[in-house]
Each structure stands twice: as structure tokens, then as C-alpha cells.
UniProtKB/Swiss-Prot annotation:
Classification via SMART domains: eIF-5a
Family: Belongs to the eIF-5A family.
Membrane-related topology note: Peripheral membrane protein
GO terms assigned for molecular function: ribosome binding; RNA binding; translation elongation factor activity
Positions carrying Hypusine: 50
GO biological process: positive regulation of translational elongation; positive regulation of translational termination; translational elongation
Taxonomic lineage: Eukaryota, Metazoa, Chordata, Craniata, Vertebrata
Residue numbers carrying N-acetylalanine: 2
Function: Translation factor that promotes translation elongation and termination, particularly upon ribosome stalling at specific amino acid sequence contexts. Binds between the exit (E) and peptidyl (P) site of the ribosome and promotes rescue of stalled ribosome: specifically required for efficient translation of polyproline-containing peptides as well as other motifs that stall the ribosome. Acts as a ribosome quality control (RQC) cofactor by joining the RQC complex to facilitate peptidyl transfer during CAT tailing step.
Species per Swiss-Prot/TrEMBL record: Gallus gallus (Chicken)
UniProt name for this protein: Eukaryotic translation initiation factor 5A-2
Amino acid sequence: MADELDFTTGDAGASSTYPMQCSALRKNGFVVLKGRPCKIVEMSTSKTGKHGHAKVHLVGIDIFNGKKYEDICPSTHNMDVPNIKRNDYQLIGIQDGYLSLLTESGEVREDLKLPEGDLGKEIEGKFNANEDVQISVISAMNEECAVAIKPCK
């Protein structure tokens, strides 16, 4: 029986989010609003009413696309907080709108799109000028995105 089990594939099983009580959330922290990982930019609490709990009004900006989301929830309720990882990779190429990135272990990743807008133009410009740069990649809830560029150390 044990010979048939294969544990070589898959991740560690870590959840992409964890619960946190609404009243424990803080500005500049992270929360899942409308199913999207967001950075909290505004937060206000209303007093308890005649019936019910204090309410927390949250305003967040999606960390991947910059859209604004709002939600109101009782302060005693739990909200999902995304597990966010940030990694730096060395840029070694750009091909067909995708970045070629070198990981710390020496492997090459070619599955990340060149970001649109100013950041994408800056990455292309520095690469074309043969500058050694690192790309900061943020990942949360099975999504990844290049968010910053910095010179190699």
C-alpha cells in the first residue's frame, strides 16, 4: 500500500489566506475584499448601535491591479488575510512580453509577464541598456506580479 503513494508533487498545503478578527486589522495591512487581495488604505469604525455590533468600514486597493474595493463588516467577525510572499529575482532576459528571471537556486523562470505601464517601460529600458537589475515579485492567492525594480547588489 505504501509503495503506491506519491508525495513528490504539490505544495506544502499552506492556505492562501488566514482568518483575522475585523477589529484587529490595521491600515497598511492586507485583507481579502470581494475575493481580491488588497492593501488597507482607509479604515473607520462605527459605534455599536441599539442592536448589534460595532461595524468596521474597510477601503482597500487590489495589490495586483490597483482597483479600489470597499466592505463593511461587524468588528467581531473574521476576515480573510492573504498570505503574501515577496521574492527578488535577477532579470536575465525579456522575450515575447515575458520576463526571464533567475532564482536564487539558479533556476530560470519564464512564466511572468512583463508588467504594463511605467514599470514595464522602466524594466525594458534598463534591460536594453544592459543594466543588472532585480525584479521584485509579489505573490498571493495563486497570482503573481512584478511590482518593483532595483539595481543588483
